[in-house]
Regions:
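Conserved core of the sugar-phosphate nucleotidyltransferase
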Residues: 114-194
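A short acidic, often aromatic-flanked loop/helix-cap motif at beta-alpha or helix-coil junctions
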Residues: 82-87, 139, 225-228
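Conserved N-terminal catalytic core of the sugar/cofactor nucleotidyltransferase
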Residues: 1-4, 12-14, 26, 30-104
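Short beta-strand-to-loop acidic/aromatic patch adjacent to the donor-nucleotide binding site
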Residues: 103-114
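Short beta-strand/turn micro-motifs composed of small residues
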Residues: 6-7, 53, 110, 133-134
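Short acidic/His/Gly/Ser-rich catalytic and metal-binding motifs that mark active-site loops
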Residues: 9-15, 181-184
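Conserved alpha/beta core of the MobA/IspD/sugar-nucleotide pyrophosphorylase nucleotidyltransferase superfamily
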Residues: 2, 167-247
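Short alpha-helical oligomerization interface
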Residues: 18-23
Length: 247
């Protein structure tokens, strides 16, 4: 199952004068939503898609209309009545409402990232989970620290703390939904400490719980030129101004 959390408040976009939710904004003749979802075009017929959105903003009708236009075979929309404490809690509530079996694999992806031609990496097939990364500058990312330079095994993840040059793209895989759920529930049990450390309930730091339990977590590095971000008004504006097709 591919899970798309999209229940954020889009405050930066609202403050910049945008009236509609970020995912509805136009980009290259489509919505940003459609551009992001086309990342998984090869899976439109084979995978279920779960969208977790805010109630009361017309999200369900918009998502289902776009999914029908794109040809996504099995879309499901869960709407939330109240804000969450972060992306991880949004995903957790969506999985619960959708009745996702704990044995199912889940792939979580941001609705403001475009990953043209995505294909599941074969080397991650025998892992308990994986994070996609690019090499980039700055402190505003989620980060992965490899166990060594000779392996793709992950020793640690962090949020807004640069522990390596490997920056998460917002694509997170868990071989079992139950592992994600357990890690998220552990974080919620100590939400005060977790929020003090990370600011909100992000997905990437949850992998530390799984790593501590002996799970085999790996990373896959994508070329930076193959990942396009629209998480801020500046990033979105740059994509609009580029007037180029996304490879």
């Amino acid at each position: 199952m591919i899970v798309i959390p999209m229940a954020g408040q889009s405050r930066r976009f609202r403050d910049a004068g945008y009236a509609r939710p970020k995912y509805e904004l136009p980009l290259h003749g489509e919505s940003l939503f459609a551009c992001c979802l086309r990342s998984f075009e090869r899976y439109f017929d084979s995978e279920r898609f779960l969208f977790v959105a805010r109630a009361g903003c017309g999200a369900e009708a918009f998502v289902l209309e776009e999914c029908a236009r794109l040809g996504i075979a099995e879309p499901r929309v869960v709407t939330l009545d109240a804000p969450t404490r972060g992306q991880a809690e949004t995903v957790l509530l969506g999985l619960r409402e959708a009745g996702c079996p704990g044995s199912d694999a889940i792939l979580v992806f941001n609705i403001d990232t475009i990953r043209p031609g995505y294909s599941f990496p074969p080397e991650a097939a025998h892992s308990d989970g994986y994070l996609e990364v690019v090499r980039a500058a700055g402190e505003h990312w989620s980060f992965v620290r490899p166990a060594s330079s000779l392996t793709r095994r992950v020793a640690e993840t962090s949020e807004k703390r640069r522990i390596s040059a490997l920056c998460c793209t917002g694509l997170y895989y868990f071989a079992r939904a139950a592992d994600f759920t357990a890690a998220c529930e552990t974080a919620l049990q100590t939400a005060g400490d977790y929020l003090e450390c990370w600011g909100e309930l992000y997905v990437a730091p949850l992998y530390n719980t799984l790593i501590g339990a002996g799970k085999h977590i790996v990373y896959d590095e994508a070329p930076a030129s193959r990942v396009h971000f629209a998480g801020t008004p500046a990033e979105y504006g740059a994509l609009v101004a580029s007037h180029r097709s996304l490879p």
